[in-house]
């Protein structure tokens, strides 16, 4: 090994491909021209670039999250739990990534945000179609949340499909019923567009699983994957609240909500209630 090699010598020695006139390059594969050209600040403020990239990268992570969630829901519906577990674990890690992403936006100070806020008009993360699909896939159904997408038939179709489909938890309960556990028909054959209502019989079914993990190991693991997922989702929401409060205080959000007050209320939403309640009753 020659420790005196210069960088140019290393590239030559490794025979790295340098000519892409007739081959697909890294930028070609990733369509980087389109991605890196998508940041179009409207204000003269230096910090608007941070604001745009924060939200664009979050949307990319949410695209992957939806890709994994939809596949995981299909896996659970088909009793393919091994495949579902891998995807749900990945979703939890994506949420962890998004939690840390708030640390970057938190470097924006109130005066810096105030300089760009007038240029945002009524645009808001509240209107994110992908985030709404994630909430619907996790069971937080609310018909009013379709309205922000009514002006875009393509987006309306996307969120409506998620709204009308069984959620991850719906499919988990149907799986428990297929395995012979006593889950009421009111929770396995219901109107999927309605919000989930906590049920004692559902908790009893989960308690059966948690009292005998050895017999119901894969269902027990499913319960813990759901717990991990909601735990990660809560942290993501909480970090959103604290970042918004740090940057804008209690001003109303650009989307018309109360801002921090709205986000704090959303922290109280429980997605998989029986899995949390059984920990007290076990």
From Swiss-Prot:
Per UniProt, where does heme bind?
240
A GO molecular function assigned to this protein is: tryptophan 2,3-dioxygenase activity
Catalysed reaction(s) here are: L-tryptophan + O2 = N-formyl-L-kynurenine
Q: In which pathway does it act?
A: Amino-acid degradation; L-tryptophan degradation via kynurenine pathway; L-kynurenine from L-tryptophan: step 1/2
Protein residues bound to substrate: 51-55, 113, 117, 254
Tell me the organism.
Polaromonas naphthalenivorans (strain CJ2)
Cofactors (names): heme
Name listed for the protein in its UniProt record:
Tryptophan 2,3-dioxygenase
What family does the database annotate? Belongs to the tryptophan 2,3-dioxygenase family.
UniProt cofactor note: Binds 1 heme group per subunit.
Q: Name one GO biological process term.
A: L-tryptophan catabolic process to kynurenine
Keywords of the record: Dioxygenase, Heme, Iron, Metal-binding, Oxidoreductase, Tryptophan catabolism
Quaternary structure per UniProt?
Homotetramer.
| Classification via InterPro entries | Trp/Indoleamine_2_3_dOase-like, Trp_2-3-dOase_bac, Trp_2_3_dOase
């Amino acid at each position: 090994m020659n420790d005196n090699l210069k960088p140019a010598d290393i590239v030559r020695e490794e025979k790295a491909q340098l000519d892409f006139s007739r081959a697909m390059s890294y930028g070609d594969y990733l369509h980087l021209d389109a991605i890196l050209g998508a940041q179009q600040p409207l204000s003269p403020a230096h910090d608007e670039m941070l604001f745009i990239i924060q939200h664009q990268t979050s949307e990319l992570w949410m695209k992957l999250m939806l890709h994994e969630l939809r596949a995981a829901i299909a896996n659970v519906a088909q009793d393919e739990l091994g495949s579902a577990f891998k995807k749900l674990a990945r979703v939890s890690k994506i949420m962890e990534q998004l939690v840390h992403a708030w640390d970057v936006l938190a470097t924006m100070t109130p005066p810096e945000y105030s300089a760009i806020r007038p240029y945002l008009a009524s645009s808001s993360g509240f209107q994110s179609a992908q985030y709404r699909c994630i909430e619907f896939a996790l069971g937080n159904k609310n018909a009013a949340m379709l309205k922000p997408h009514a002006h875009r038939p393509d987006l309306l179709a996307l969120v409506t499909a998620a709204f009308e489909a069984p959620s991850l938890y719906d499919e988990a309960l149907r799986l428990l019923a297929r395995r012979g556990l006593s889950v009421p028909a009111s929770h396995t054959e219901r109107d999927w567009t309605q919000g989930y209502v906590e049920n004692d019989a559902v908790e009893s079914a989960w308690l059966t699983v948690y009292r005998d993990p050895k017999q119901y190991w894969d269902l027990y693991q499913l319960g813990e994957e759901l717990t991990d997922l909601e735990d990660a989702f809560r942290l993501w929401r909480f970090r959103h609240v604290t970042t918004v409060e740090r940057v804008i205080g209690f001003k109303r959000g650009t989307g018309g909500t109360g801002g921090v007050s709205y986000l704090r209320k959303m922290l109280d939403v429980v997605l998989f209630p029986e899995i949390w309640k059984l920990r007290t009753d076990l």
